[in-house]
Amino acid sequence: MIKRNKLFGNQTRVTFCLPRDAPPGPVSVVGSFNGWEPGRHEMVTRRDGTRTVTVKLPPGEYRFRYLATGGVWLDDEAADQVDDRGSLLRI
């Protein structure tokens, strides 16, 4: 799931959320907005078992995927588009 909240100016707060049944262990959101760097936006487990991380982004198009332990890649069906290159987010 992806939540978007428009902030003052041209920034949007984007919250990425994975369900409880996602693979165990650390998961990072990696994408064009962070140089595809694992660990830079690591997801935090919430009390309800979901995992989230929030980033602020200016307008644009961003490719991203979730990277789980063991090199497991996950896409987000809530993205604006999903294809063989991953998920696409339009702000």
What are the roles of these predicted feature ranges?
Residues 9-59, 67-91:
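Aromatic-rich carbohydrate-binding modules that target alpha-glucans
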Residues 1-10:
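N-terminal edge beta-strand
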